Amino acid sequence: MLEDVKNRVYVMKLDGNWKREPLVGAPEFGTVNIMAVDPDESNEFFLTTTDYLTPTTLSYGVIGQQPKPLKSLPAFFDASGLEISQHFATSKDGTKVPYFMVAKKGLELNGANPTLLYGYGGFEISLQ
């Protein structure tokens, strides 16, 4: 499910009533794909993740345990000094519009930093 344009993966457990718990090891940011190994016989799954700073990674997991990476695409740059954060802009009508920022860790957000801004219009229609 998406929550403020961030993927959220939950495990549903039946204990008298349905309970929703976050999937252990699901990343905070980025794209997440999950596929059951054998949904009728096990709690095992394959998890594919990627984000602005992390190459696509395939992991194997068992519900309730940290997934184990199996294979990753190569990294094309050193992301160790960078971080992803989410912020919200307010439109003229008061709607909160989420956006992500990739910046140096600990960057002072004082309005004086050079910025490369990219936007996507949605519905497969890019900004022009």
Stretch-by-stretch model annotation:
Residues M1-Y118, G122-Q128:
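Peripheral, non-catalytic segments that deliver or gate enzyme domains
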